[in-house]
């Protein structure tokens, strides 16, 4: 699906992961809301090198995924013209991390940016989510980052050993 840029006329920007959800959610929220998709993760560890600062508390060095530059720049433009930006990524550690990365990329304050979650895409569930926002759960973000860092460390260290074993 093509990302079609346009000027945001709505007061609120809601960012979801999946474009399939955006039209239905927009229909439930009405004209004061624009709903756009991030198409999943917008940043990741670099493809070259480890991308983890081991000396600095295993700090991950995230980079914008090349295929997400356009999406992020459009979300940034729309967010800047909205009165409020809402994070509505999936309610799991991946979704929480995606929301946190988006908030950081858009220079939104993670302590005050409304985070909404819903378990079904119904008018009632969406309206309840908007009435009861929370903030990004940094415990879930930390859990996802720990998993991502461990995946990279194990993969980075094991790959050469595995390749040597495969070749012999």
Q: Language model features by range: what are they?
A:
Residues 166-168:
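Catalytic and ligand-binding motifs that coordinate phosphates/metal ions
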Residues 3-164:
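Intrinsically disordered, low-complexity regulatory segments
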């Amino acid at each position: 699906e093509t990302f079609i840029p346009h000027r945001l006329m709505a007061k609120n920007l809601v960012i979801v992961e999946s474009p399939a959800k955006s039209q239905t959610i927009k229909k439930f929220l009405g004209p004061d809301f624009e709903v756009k998709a991030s198409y999943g993760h917008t940043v990741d560890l670099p493809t070259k090198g480890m991308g983890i600062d081991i000396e600095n508390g295993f700090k991950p060095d995230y980079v914008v995924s090349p295929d997400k530059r356009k999406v992020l720049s459009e979300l940034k433009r729309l967010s800047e013209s909205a009165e409020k930006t809402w994070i509505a990524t999936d309610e799991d550690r991946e979704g929480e991390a995606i929301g946190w990365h988006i908030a950081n990329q858009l220079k939104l304050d993670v302590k005050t940016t409304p985070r909404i979650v819903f378990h079904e895409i119904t008018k009632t569930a969406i309206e309840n989510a908007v009435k009861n926002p929370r903030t990004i759960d940094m415990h879930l973000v930390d859990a996802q980052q720990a998993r991502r860092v461990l995946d990279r460390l194990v993969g980075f260290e094991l790959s050469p050993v595995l390749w040597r074993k495969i070749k012999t």
